[in-house]
């Protein structure tokens, strides 16, 4: 797979959309909350492009779909509570990711996850995916002062896995 990998000591993955497809569980949680408020559901495929912006991004998309401003503070807390209980129903590793992880481990390359998502969700997802023992580090949004794209989480991951920066 990798030709000259002597220089590669570790690989860090983002969680949502890179390592795993979490979009269906996020969409289902959002749609349950929208249903409770008699609002239109969102299309899960279209929602994917908003997921990188977290709960606020998906709620903004719901506002667009519904053609009106939605009270994001209330909806956000309801959405996050539902998602906490349903964050690993349909979530899966992305296509061929299991093979890539196996390969990296066979080459003794450390693997880590760096995400803006809160640890209360990430821990359940990582455990559900069955990869918690394969990871040298997991850095979540609540572990750093400044979320990505700031470098705080990447620097923390490098420190944890003792990777030269």
Question: What would you call each of these model-derived segments?
Answer:
Residues 89-90, 118-165:
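Substrate-recognition "cap/lid" segment bordering the active-site pocket of phosphatases
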Residues 10-12, 112, 137:
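Hydrophobic "anchor" residues on beta-strands that sit immediately upstream
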